[in-house]
Structures are given as C-alpha cells and as structure tokens.
Design a protein with these regions (language model features):
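N-terminal presequence-like segments and the immediate start of the first folded domain
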Residues: 1-73, 77-91, 96-161
C-alpha cells in the first residue's frame, strides 16, 4: 500500500517588474503552486447602501478618493469572507473613468495611486507600488455602470491550504 500522502503547502511568488534599474509599480507575474483554488471578484464599485441597479436606485459614494477607499475595504472584506486575503492576491485590474487630460489613464484625477498605497501600507505593505505589488493593469474607460462611478476593480486571489 502507499505511504501517507499529504497536501503540499501553497506557494505564491510575485516577481518584480523593472525598466532598466527602476522598479515599476506593478508586478511582472505571480506564480502560484499548490493552491486549493482561486477567488475571482468582479464589479467592485463604491455605491450607496441602498443601491439597486434593477430599479436604477442609488449610485456612487463621494469623491474619487472616497470611492477608492470604499472599494479597497470592500474587496478586502470579500476576500476574507471567501477564504482568501490580501496576502494572496494574484492579479488586479483597475477600470478608471476619464477624463484623461494628457491622453493616458494615469493622468486622470480619478486614478489614485496615493490612496492605493495608503491602503496597502496599512493592510498589506508588500503590495505597495514601491514594494512588490501583484501584476495589475489600469484600463481607461468612458463610463462605468453608474454615471458617478469613477473606478471599478476586478481581483483574482489564491485560496490557501
């Protein structure tokens, strides 16, 4: 008969992205081995408590910084509820609504890297843009589900053992 079989421990390694010798504020890629599974979070937006899209009721809360803080807190709570955490992020996609004064998404007043770094500095420092963030992409959009929304997040995280 066979010997005792044990599950391997999950390993998640995010590789840094450099341009020359400069560290970029996104990861090159994340390699996950022996994960129990994955969590996919989509449509994370900052809406009022009584938001009801089927009745066109409610909309976004606050200014761009307030929306970013709310979304980040929401996705942290959602990950934890589903058995993962910020430590196990594999990839993040940011959809940022214009305007884009110089043509690029990063020029939008709705893109708030400062708020993102503030959040990660408090909750998961390894993912700050100046440290070793997960791979991510920032995509500029003309509109989101509600006219006053300025950012939406899609997150993939691994489920640990």
């Amino acid at each position: 008969m066979g010997g005792l079989v044990t599950e391997a421990e999950m390993n998640l390694t995010t590789h840094k992205k450099f341009k020359g010798d400069r560290l970029m504020p996104w990861g090159k890629g994340t390699v996950v081995t022996d994960a129990k599974g994955y969590v996919f979070l989509c449509g994370n937006t900052a809406t009022v408590d009584d938001y009801d899209p089927s009745r066109h009721k409610g909309g976004a809360i606050g200014d761009p910084a307030t929306q970013w803080r709310a979304i980040l807190a929401n996705f942290k709570a959602d990950l934890e509820e589903l058995g993962s955490s910020l430590d196990h992020l594999v990839k993040v996609t940011f959809y940022v609504k214009g305007p884009f004064p110089t043509g690029g998404v990063l020029s939008s007043p709705n893109f708030r890297l400062d708020v993102l770094d503030e959040f990660f500095a408090e909750h998961c420092p390894k993912h700050c843009s100046y440290n070793n963030p997960p791979p991510s992409e920032v995509i500029g959009v003309a509109a989101l589900a509600q006219p006053d929304l300025v950012v939406e997040l899609v997150v993939i995280a691994a489920l640990p053992d």
